[in-house]
Amino acid sequence: MGGLTLFAAQGCKAPKQVAEQAEHPNIIYVFPDQYRNQAMGFWNQEGFRDKVNFRGDPVHTPNIDTFARESMVLTSAQSNCPLSSPHRGMLLTGMYPNRSGVPLNCNSTRPISSLRDDAECIGDVFSKAGYDCAYFGKLHADFPTPNDPENPGQYVETQRPVWDAYTPKEQRHGFNYWYSYGTFDEHKNPHYWDTDGKRHDPKEWSPLHESGKVVSYLKNEGNVRDTKKPFFIMVGMNPPHSPYRSLNDCEEQDFNLYKDQPLDSLLIRPNVDLNMKKAESVRYYFASVTGVDRAFGQILEALKQLGLDKNTVVIFASDHGETMCSQRTDDPKNSPYSESMNIPFLVRFPGKIQPRVDDLLLSAPDIMPTVLGLCGLGDSIPSEVQGRNFAPLFFDEKAEIVRPAGALYIQNLDGEKDKDGLVQSYFPSSRGIKTARYTLALYIDRKTKQLKKSLLFDDVNDPYQLNNLPLDENKEVVEQLYREMGTMLKEIDDPWYTEKILSDRIPY
């Protein structure tokens, strides 16, 4: 297990806490940042490799691999707007970026991008249902304001624009236990604000520190939770998010697994450019992947030792992926490429969810209602939620439920700015759709809002998206994709629908 001793002596087992099992199960949602679906070792193992048409990354993830064999594993979960804050807005609210309040990455120049105070978020629902709710790690869903609890009237950091943020109690949406921050990318020098607003600077690689705090919470050290209630835990780990360029960013024992490996044995995807400067980063990225696996394993082991594993739904996911030299792009995310959009989504619920692999096209706004459904709270899903509850499918693979035809792709950029440089609107630069077979993305000109670029890939015959198909040579396919995309954009009241963008092509 490395990095954390769960219990002092082998002969001293922790007290079983089965007595606290309630009508509703416990739930733990772990979502490391920028963790792509391909970066899990089990994809290269028997029982999994024949379920996908890509090669998994050569990563060491023993805990996730074991967990996968106990879980329902999705091959095609999608981060519809594959960027930190917009995904988190969708995750927490069950709404797309135009409704969640978070269309852009949150920083102090973007007052228009912040989680809505009036939204009924996933923590609100669990709290009202009698859960003890705890949030650990990165949040990155709030507009930073000068509200440093230790320095009133000041921001929590001096750099401009301000990215990091303190979330006061009235904005925590049902989470009664808090050990979190906005966003901060010094992985071995993290900081957190606790429930009472006190800052902690642990000087420890952040995923391992967070897993230790989760274990402490599970063991109820310091009497921090009500053991008569079921718990809902979210763990937002920052790695393997960049930076990934030195041992300041990962644990040396994890880096040692990759440091002597040739780059072409690590970056194995056919769409990779090994000549990119970023290529050397793969060793550190994979090291962080392995470190996250170790931290995740510590949480799983604690559940088992405490007798909580049988009545706890555990989900492993991410907010978006990482291109890592694929498609010759320096942008690790915010694109329709599979390395960016396709995220892990593994769900374990012993005795309730049969371990298997499924190709459900799960969208980010579907996660909140589905998680509530898994816990028997389907009737408590807020009316504003735009996502769908797919819990019946998790419980029964033969459930009569209409599967989604596709998942939307959304990219927004900064729009108009005021005289102080504050962003007052967002520009809906691209929309697209991912279906079981195709990926389509349309990009528009900022001034004319006319089509300036398109991407169309046959993901079945071209899984690494090497061949961008011309729209005019694939009219029948494109028209069907336009119809499906238009229907979905209309359903969520997206700006492309309200402004009738590219209405000469898309039949809204």
From Swiss-Prot:
A Pfam match: Sulfatase
Keyword list, A-Z: Hydrolase
Disulfide-linked positions: none
Modification after translation: The conversion to 3-oxoalanine (also known as C-formylglycine, FGly), of a serine or cysteine residue in prokaryotes and of a cysteine residue in eukaryotes, is critical for catalytic activity.
UniProt cross-references to InterPro entries, sorted A to Z: Alkaline_phosphatase_core_sf, Sulfatase, Sulfatase_N
3-oxoalanine (Ser) found at: 84
One term of GO molecular function: arylsulfatase activity
EC number: 3.1.6.-
CDD domains: sulfatase_like (cd16034)
Function: Endosulfatase involved in the degradation of the glycosaminoglycans (GAGs) chondroitin sulfate (CS) and dermatan sulfate (DS). Efficiently hydrolyzes sulfate groups from a broad range of substrate size, including disaccharide to high molecular weight CS and DS polymers. Has a strict specificity for the 4-O-sulfate groups of galactosamine. GAG-specific sulfatases play a key role in the persistence of the major human gut symbiont B.thetaiotaomicron in the host gastrointestinal tract.
Family indicated by similarity: Belongs to the sulfatase family.
Protein name as it appears in the record: Endo-4-O-sulfatase
